[in-house]
């Protein structure tokens, strides 16, 4: 029987001060025995302590673990803390939520996603990004049973993070082109519904760039809802294909090259300009949309060298070689990479 499982959150809560309802929400979901709260060193004071207080007000037993990084060691360490009857609440950015996903999946318990930023679509997807000694890889996990997104907290986070989330969403445009290309040339499985949802998510950002401003609760709410729909596209597809193509392999190549990589969404945004040019698409529209939401559009704005861009472009096809993209099996030459980056203004 050709059966496929599509995981989605049971409930999603988005709004100002919703964090103070954490205990009631977990109680309603019958996650009221014991909760392991995972958070970061900065997000404890910003958000986690309020969630913990709300849980304790509902007489829910709470353990707390500060997560410093995403690695197999940190996931294993958290997994060992999950005892019978314990569920997981991930409070923070992408790293914390990825550890929550992986550890809860390992122990087959529920987890609740509580993002404090809206910097990428991992807040709801069933996949997690985890670093190994060479690069970041996508690991299978499970979707959260619920998402609690306090739009006031997210609006008060650095605008650069929200801008990066917008750039990550805009990158769906080239991700879908790559997926369609792989479907035509390699007969790769393709989902029209997942692709349509992914493109709709990207258009929600490009159609509303003038509404995305620093400190606005409405801006945070819009981006979170759009990241949610993009994450749902990933769930429907059963892979990250709807939101990850050649622009993401460019970003992952930069991760390998740079001692201190830029934000994931920022790198993907610049990659989208480059890959849209290769497709003969409207790369200027991509560039202008990124500028409108405050995202970088050049090596200089990313704070990296021209050589870093060229190296990443020529290396990108070696990242996830099983995933066919516009870069093909053999990639592009150094001369072609230079011309591409120069013509799009990514380098000067």
Swiss-Prot record:
Keywords carried by this UniProt record: Cytoplasm, Lipid biosynthesis, Lipid metabolism, Metal-binding, NAD, NADP, Oxidoreductase, Phospholipid biosynthesis, Phospholipid metabolism, Zinc
Record flagged with keyword Methyltransferase: no
Disulphide bridges: none
Residues that, per the record, bind NAD(+): 94-98, 116-119, 125
GO BP term, pick one: glycerophospholipid metabolic process
This protein's pathway: Membrane lipid metabolism; glycerophospholipid metabolism
Record-level Gene Ontology MF annotations: glycerol-1-phosphate dehydrogenase (NAD+) activity; glycerol-1-phosphate dehydrogenase (NADP+) activity; metal ion binding
Residues given in the record as Zn(2+) binding sites: 168, 248, 264
Cofactors named for this entry: Zn(2+)
UniProt cofactor note: Binds 1 zinc ion per subunit.
Catalytic activity: sn-glycerol 1-phosphate + NAD(+) = dihydroxyacetone phosphate + NADH + H(+); sn-glycerol 1-phosphate + NADP(+) = dihydroxyacetone phosphate + NADPH + H(+)
Record InterPro entries: G1P_dehydrogenase_arc, G1PDH, Glycerol_DH
Cellular localization per UniProt: Cytoplasm
The keyword Coiled coil is assigned to this record: no
Subunit structure: Homooctamer.
Free-text function comment from the UniProt entry: Catalyzes the NAD(P)H-dependent reduction of dihydroxyacetonephosphate (DHAP or glycerone phosphate) to glycerol 1-phosphate (G1P). The G1P thus generated is used as the glycerophosphate backbone of phospholipids in the cellular membranes of Archaea.
Similarity-based family: Belongs to the glycerol-1-phosphate dehydrogenase family.
Protein name according to UniProt: Glycerol-1-phosphate dehydrogenase [NAD(P)+]
Organism the protein comes from: Methanobrevibacter smithii (strain ATCC 35061 / DSM 861 / OCM 144 / PS)
Organism lineage: Archaea, Methanobacteriati, Methanobacteriota, Methanomada group, Methanobacteria
């Amino acid at each position: 029987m050709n059966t496929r499982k599509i995981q989605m959150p049971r409930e999603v809560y988005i709004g100002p001060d919703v964090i103070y309802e954490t205990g009631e929400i977990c109680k309603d979901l019958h996650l009221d025995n014991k909760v392991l709260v995972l958070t970061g060193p900065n997000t404890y004071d910003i958000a986690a302590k309020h969630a913990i207080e709300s849980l304790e007000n509902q007489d829910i037993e709470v353990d707390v673990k500060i997560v410093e990084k995403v690695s197999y060691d940190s996931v294993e360490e958290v997994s060992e803390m999950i005892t019978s009857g314990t569920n997981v609440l991930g409070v923070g950015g992408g790293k914390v939520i990825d550890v929550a996903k992986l550890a809860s999946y390992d122990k087959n318990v529920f987890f609740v996603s509580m993002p404090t930023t809206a910097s990428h679509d991992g807040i709801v997807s069933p996949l997690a990004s985890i670093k190994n000694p060479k690069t970041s890889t996508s690991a299978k996990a499970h979707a959260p049973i619920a998402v609690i997104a306090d739009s006031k907290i997210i609006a008060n986070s650095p605008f650069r993070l929200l801008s990066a989330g917008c750039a990550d969403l805009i990158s769906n445009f080239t991700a879908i082109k790559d997926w369609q290309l792989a479907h035509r040339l390699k007969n790769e499985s393709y989902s029209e519904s997942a692709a349509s949802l992914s493109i709709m998510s990207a258009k929600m950002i490009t159609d509303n760039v003038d509404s995305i401003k620093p400190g606005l609760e409405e801006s945070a709410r819009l981006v979170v809802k759009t990241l949610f729909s993009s994450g749902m596209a990933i769930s429907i597809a059963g892979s990250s294909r709807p939101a990850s193509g050649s622009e993401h392999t460019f970003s992952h190549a930069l991760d390998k090259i740079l001692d201190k990589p830029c934000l994931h969404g920022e790198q993907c945004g610049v990659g989208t300009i480059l890959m849209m040019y290769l497709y003969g698409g409207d790369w200027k529209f991509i560039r202008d949309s990124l500028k409108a939401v405050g995202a970088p559009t050049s090596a200089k704005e990313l704070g990296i060298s021209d050589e870093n861009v060229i190296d990443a472009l020529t290396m990108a096809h070696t990242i996830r070689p099983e995933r066919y993209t516009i870069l093909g099996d053999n990639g592009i030459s150094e001369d072609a990479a230079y011309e591409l980056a120069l013509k799009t203004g990514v380098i000067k």
